[in-house]
């Protein structure tokens, strides 16, 4: 559950001056890096291979796969258990998280107009996908059954924590609301996701537009020479004399 909700928060701005590079427009979906295993150290996304056009099909496929995984849990004829319900749900959405982590990173620190437009397009889809899981009555019934019978399950501390957080995620996500209240909650969640995204993008634009121009090197006394050199290079790029700084958000 937490992984799914995380996917809806892609617009959080982690920082830095953005890039204005655009994709080359070539359809490379046949070699989409998200559809293969990473061969990078520690599973770091191979950003040098990832194009903007790779994200949307990977997100759509990721949501499709997780929906199928959730349906398999819901339609399991066996009695709900910790393994076939809680663990299965926690392990669902692997592809969705794979692309979400990469996209949120790029959208935060190396964004452009294409990526921001894609954020606007994906945000309501991800909000709906999250709600479709959180507000699935049959899925919640299975989770609730495991939660209410946990005393019989001999769970360790980690398992108990996962069960508790999963159950609370559903309750806080509106699983106990009636149909009308859930419909209203869906609308609010979509509005909130779009407002958060728009705020983040506007904040990033303001950050990127900021310039602090220092005319005299002595005013930078005490700063490392590497930082002073970087400021001079930034000023040169921006056609300014002296030393210029942008805001780095972390």
Task: Please annotate each region the language model reported.
Residues 7-15:
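Bacterial N-terminal signal peptides
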Residues 17-250:
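Zn2+-dependent metallopeptidase catalytic domains
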Residues 1-6:
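Bacterial N-terminal signal peptides that target proteins for export
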């Amino acid at each position: 559950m937490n992984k799914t909700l995380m996917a809806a928060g892609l617009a959080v701005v982690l920082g830095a001056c953005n890039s204005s590079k655009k994709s080359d427009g070539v359809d490379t979906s046949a070699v989409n890096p998200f559809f293969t295993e990473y061969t990078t150290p520690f599973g770091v996304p191979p950003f040098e291979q990832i194009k903007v056009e790779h994200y949307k099909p990977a997100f759509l496929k990721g949501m499709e796969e997780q929906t199928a995984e959730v349906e398999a849990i819901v339609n399991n004829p066996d009695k709900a258990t910790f393994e076939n319900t809680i663990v299965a749900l926690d392990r669902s959405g692997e592809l969705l998280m794979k692309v979400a982590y990469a996209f949120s990173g790029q959208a935060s620190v190396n964004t452009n107009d294409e990526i921001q437009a894609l954020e606007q397009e994906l945000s309501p889809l991800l909000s709906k996908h999250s709600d479709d899981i959180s507000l699935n009555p049959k899925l919640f019934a299975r989770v609730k059954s495991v939660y209410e019978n946990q005393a019989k399950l001999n769970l360790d501390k980690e398992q108990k924590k996962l069960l508790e957080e999963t159950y609370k995620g559903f309750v806080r996500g509106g699983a106990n609301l009636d149909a009308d209240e859930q419909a209203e909650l869906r609308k609010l969640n979509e509005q909130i996701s779009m407002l958060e995204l728009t705020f983040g993008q506007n904040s990033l634009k303001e950050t990127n537009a900021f310039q602090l121009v220092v005319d005299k090197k002595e005013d930078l006394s005490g700063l490392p020479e590497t930082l002073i050199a970087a400021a001079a290079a930034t000023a040169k790029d921006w056609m300014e004399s002296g030393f210029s700084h942008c805001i780095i958000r972390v």
